C-alpha cells in the first residue's frame, strides 16, 4: 500500500529555475559553485571570476530597531569582489531603492574585514587605520516582471547595467558599485533565436520547467551540469519535498496577490466614486470624480497590500520577507 505522505519524485522533466529552493540550490551551494561562476562570467562580460566563497545571507542592522536584510545569494570572488544575486518573482514598491540598500551592507562590512585582517597580522588593533579603499560590490537581480524605465526604453531590452557616473559627461565616479538587472518579462526569444550566453540563460530561467529534454544548443559544460542538477530524476525525496514546498508558497502568493488586487481595486473604485461624487457637488463634478477616483485607487492599493500581508501571515511566511514583498512597515504587519 502506498503511503499518502510518501514523496514520489517524477521520472522525467526539469525543475523551475526561479523556484526559491531551486534558485538557491543552483546558485548558492558548494555543489553547484561551478554553475554560479559560469553565470557571473557571462553576466559581467569583461570580468573574470576564478573562484567564489559563499558568504552569510542574513545581515542584521546596527541596532535592534534597524532594518535587516536577507539576500538570496552572497559571495566573494578570489579577487575580493562581492556579489549579491537576487531572484525577484513579484514586483514590489521601491525595488530599486531596496537594491541600493542591500549593497550598503557589504560596503560597510569592508571596514570590519580590514580590521580583522590587521588583527590577524599584528595580534592587536593598536594603530589600525583604514584607507577607505573599497573592493567592488555588484548587485545582480533576475526579475520576473518589467521594471520601470524611461518612456523611450526599448520594450525588448532585458539587460541593464548601472554605475555611479557624472550626469553630463558620463565619467565614472569609480567602478566599485554596479547594479545589473535581467528582466524576464522583456525576453521573448525562441530557441532558434538564441545566440549569446545571455540569451541562453534567460531562456532557461523562463522555460526550463517546460522542457522535455535538453536542446542541442545547450552544449556548453556549464549547461550540461545545469540540466543534470535540474532534472527531477536526479532529485532525492527530500530535495523534491523542499522544491514542492517552495512551489506551493509561490502559488499561494500569486493567488493571494490576485485576490487582493481584485478586492482592493473594487473597494478603491467604490470609495473613490463615493468620495468623488461628494467632492463633485462642491468643486465641480468632473474634477471631484477625477480626484476621488485617484485617491480611492491609492487607498485600494494600500488595502491590497494589507490583504496580501494578511494572507502571507496565514501561510507562516517570515515577517521580514513580507516587509520586503509588500513595502509595508514591520509595525503595520504586526498589527494585522
Residue ranges with predicted function:
Residues 1-336:
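Elongated, amphipathic alpha-helical interaction scaffolds
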Amino acid at each position: 500500500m502506498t503511503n499518502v505522505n510518501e514523496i514520489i519524485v517524477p521520472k522525467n522533466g526539469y525543475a523551475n529555475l526561479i523556484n526559491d529552493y531551486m534558485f538557491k540550490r543552483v546558485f548558492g551551494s558548494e555543489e553547484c559553485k561551478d554553475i554560479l561562476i559560469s553565470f557571473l562570467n557571462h553576466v559581467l562580460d569583461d570580468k573574470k571570476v576564478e573562484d567564489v566563497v559563499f558568504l552569510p545571507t542574513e545581515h542584521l542592522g546596527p541596532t535592534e530597531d534597524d532594518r535587516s536584510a536577507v539576500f538570496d545569494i552572497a559571495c566573494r570572488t578570489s579577487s575580493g569582489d562581492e556579489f549579491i544575486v537576487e531572484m525577484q518573482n513579484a514586483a514590489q514598491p521601491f525595488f530599486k531603492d531596496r537594491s541600493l540598500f542591500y549593497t550598503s551592507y557589504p560596503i560597510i562590512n569592508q571596514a570590519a574585514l580590514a580590521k580583522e585582517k590587521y588583527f590577524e597580522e599584528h595580534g592587536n588593533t593598536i594603530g589600525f587605520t583604514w584607507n577607505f579603499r573599497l573592493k567592488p560590490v555588484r548587485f545582480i537581480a533576475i526579475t520576473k516582471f518589467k521594471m520601470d524605465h524611461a518612456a523611450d526604453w526599448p520594450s525588448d531590452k532585458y539587460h541593464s547595467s548601472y554605475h555611479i557616473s557624472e550626469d553630463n559627461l558620463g565619467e565614472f565616479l569609480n567602478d566599485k558599485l554596479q547594479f545589473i538587472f535581467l528582466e524576464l518579462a522583456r525576453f521573448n526569444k525562441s530557441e532558434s533565436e538564441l545566440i549569446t550566453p545571455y540569451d541562453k540563460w534567460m531562456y532557461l530561467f523562463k522555460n526550463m520547467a517546460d522542457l522535455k529534454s535538453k536542446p542541442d544548443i545547450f552544449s556548453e559544460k556549464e549547461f550540461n551540469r545545469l540540466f543534470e542538477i535540474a532534472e527531477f530524476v536526479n532529485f532525492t525525496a527530500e530535495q523534491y519535498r523542499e522544491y514542492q514546498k517552495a512551489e506551493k508558497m509561490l502559488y499561494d502568493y500569486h493567488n493571494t496577490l490576485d485576490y487582493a488586487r481584485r478586492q482592493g481595486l473594487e473597494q478603491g473604485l467604490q470609495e473613490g466614486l463615493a468620495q468623488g461624487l461628494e467632492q463633485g457637488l462642491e468643486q465641480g463634478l468632473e474634477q471631484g470624480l477625477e480626484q476621488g477616483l485617484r485617491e480611492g485607487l491609492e487607498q485600494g492599493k494600500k488595502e491590497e497590500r494589507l490583504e496580501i500581508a494578511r494572507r502571507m501571515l496565514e501561510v507562516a511566511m517570515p515577517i521580514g520577507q513580507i516587509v520586503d514583498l509588500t513595502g509595508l512597515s514591520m509595525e503595520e504587519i504586526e498589527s494585522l
